[in-house]
């Protein structure tokens, strides 16, 4: 379809109305590329997809899609032989995750019959091996230790060397305390240094890396740690090389599937676009129209989507009707009616819903042409007439029986008598060629043409004679009156002048009386139609109420499980609260040793019930059944605390999992399933302690960022207790920089704790002064 009509009708602005409902960049790109088509099968497919998505929303009202970024360029780079960086891998990882979630959603979907949508869901590919490979990259853009054995080995050596550096520096902190401006280890240029008072700079041998702005502090790397620091620098280089090798290897593994992943991304975007169409339907009370095979148009209560508080109108353009001629004054909304018809057809032929009532029907046109000018002033010049006529001449050479033509103020801008004659001649030519046309005019001569000519119908915009204001209601079958005398009176023209003018025209008002009677009959018919629509609306409300009740019943199923969980959580909280009181009493007894208090706390926590008896809860049974592991599920390996993806199940019941570049064989008890990620996960107040296994597990870490001081100190106390119970040698505490209140609290706590051997800030690349590394006594 020609681009000019899309610009004239502002189709891009209409498409922008759907953008807020999109979740993916792929869907946004498909929306922007959307254009009308004359292929009936494509339009029918789009309509069927929207109807099926509506049915899906009835069963799953909160259906959503994981947001994804455009990856077409990434896949193209892969196909050209380039290696990807971490950010690009994260984009692919997100697409694979979105694809996996959609496949799981479709597999568990019940009570909905899908045909068109099923084709898209079933075309999504399954990549459990690649999912496992991409687990090597976490969402922060960091390559995990388990990505390869070599990377894990290098990082262990780095960790050990850094621990040695910290131990040496901690000893120096104690030995040289009087020479230091502050009793902490600082970091400068990636090296661990001591803040030495300038007066003692020659008392500590080493390399000077920085001097404070005041000159009072010199940051010295002691000679004892220089060699270790050089070893760490060398290991860091090895680490970078290994990370580069991992990127190359995973690029090679993903490369053969680049086209399939790109196709999955397109499907995700397509489903997102269909979802956005249905969300628009829900928001604007739009409908999916019926499709006519013979260019018949029936629009019920149709509105212009870009006009605020638009008046809804009915338009019927039957198969036996060639032209609709809208006559009447220029201020009644004729041009908007013209654009509403054209834009509704463009939207429908683009596979979009329309702003109309159910039962509306649209045709299929190969082209839609329009000559529409926004200028509606009676002071039109010859140049304006020439411009419009040039456009009309061009259109008349292109239109055929498969076109829809919209003509605004046909014949205007020249002598009224000649303009009216030209308008009738053009309409007659179009009628003989059987080209569907809607035209507006203020020439009264065309009223007679509409009455006397077959396959042509008059229409007008309603004018309220009581208020002398247009109502913008479309009156099909009724020619318009200019109401010039009434308007002139309203604007203040002398009644004498108006009366004199009325005597200048033919006093035979038979035609006007007939028009007036037709208007009255139309108004009466509209009242009856409005009553019928009120009944229909009541029926629709009843239908919506039933659907709402159905959805509420489904939600109650989910709520039942949540209530049971809350009940269990309350019991646990009560038990832990009682344990805290007992612990306070224990602390007051000086004869108890610290490790006995820790053990007592652990025993008390065991008293908290792990679960409430929900054996009779049907919702829980169903949820439990759904948690059975399957190929493609993301998991956490319990012994390592690392994430991976299940790739296959062995005959003996064990599972094969891809964890980064490492393939593992696991029993079901050796891993936990990872719940599907939500866009905004609910934050839970908890302290995570990961127990070491053979020194190969990740460091135990506590994140106190964003916590209140009292809350942070309580979590720190619990965290240290658990670490001691698990015989951990070292832990990390992330407190951030911020105002320094929590950092100071952590320092004071660690200074008081007799089980702490040493502590200091983390290396610059591991958090710097925003994190503290704690080493416990053996």
Curated annotation (Swiss-Prot):
Assembly mode: Homodimer. Binds to stalled ribosomes, contacting rRNA.
Domain of life of the organism encoding this protein: Bacteria
Record family assignment: Belongs to the DNA mismatch repair MutS family. MutS2 subfamily.
Keywords of this entry: ATP-binding, DNA-binding, Endonuclease, Hydrolase, Nuclease, Nucleotide-binding, RNA-binding, rRNA-binding
Species of the source: Streptococcus pneumoniae (strain P1031)
Record bears the keyword Nuclease: yes
E.C. no: 3.1.-.-, 3.6.4.-
Name of this protein: Endonuclease MutS2
Residues covered by the Smr domain: 702-777
HAMAP family (alphabetical): MutS2
Gene name in the database record: mutS2
